[in-house]
């Protein structure tokens, strides 16, 4: 069986998915139970889990509305306090984290590093009113950077650029 990086990448971004026969062959090659792979495939269709962290309740509310419009199948949760977001990420697989950089006395850059320690496959997109932070933000392995206010168009563009794409069925069609 021939599977290369581009094959796996197409599976990951859901532009091409393995059929049942391919999953059976993969299970044999990997010496795993085929049912385990089918269960993993079913879970990959789960709704993405998105968190937003911003210390402004007004901005947080606006962000949640925009994200719900663009990714209607996502479970979207907002946090004002970074520690609450960390606890949530420890107990839930987060697909996308939208983080303000200035979080009162806390730093969104530090929060990014903590979230990536919890799950290295979390997509981090920074959202800030200050373009000056862009260079620092890129040093964190973030997937993207957006300036406030958040717009549906900006979110759509960022979703195309995620390091770890996830299923966005029904999103912005």
Predicted segments with their positions:
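DNA major-groove recognition helix of helix-turn-helix/homeodomain DNA-binding modules
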Residues: 21-36
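Two-component/phosphorelay signaling modules centered on CheY-like receiver
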Residues: 57-77, 117
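Acidic, metal-coordinating helix/loop segments flanking the phosphotransfer/catalytic sites
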Residues: 78-96
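Active-site residues of response regulator receiver
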Residues: 100-101
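The feature encodes the CheY-like receiver
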Residues: 104
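Short amphipathic alpha-helix used as the core "switch/output" element in two-component signaling
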Residues: 109-121
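C-terminal output helix
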Residues: 150-159
């Amino acid at each position: 069986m021939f599977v290369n990086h581009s094959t796996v990448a197409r599976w990951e971004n859901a532009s091409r998915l393995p059929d049942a026969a391919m999953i059976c062959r993969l299970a044999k090659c990997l010496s795993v139970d085929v049912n385990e792979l089918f269960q993993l495939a079913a879970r990959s269709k789960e709704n993405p889990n998105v968190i937003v962290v911003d210390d402004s309740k007004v901005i947080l509310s606006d962000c949640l509305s925009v994200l719900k419009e663009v990714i209607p199948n996502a479970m979207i949760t907002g946090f004002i306090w970074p520690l609450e977001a960390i606890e949530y990420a420890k107990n839930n697989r987060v697909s996308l984290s939208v983080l303000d950089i200035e979080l009162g006395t806390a730093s969104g850059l530090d929060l990014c590093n903590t979230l990536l320690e919890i799950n290295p496959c979390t997509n981090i997109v920074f959202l800030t009113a200050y373009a000056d932070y862009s260079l620092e933000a890129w040093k964190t392995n973030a997937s993207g950077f957006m300036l406030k206010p958040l717009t549906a168009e900006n979110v759509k563009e960022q979703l195309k650029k995620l390091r770890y794409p996830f299923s966005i069925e029904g999103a912005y069609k």
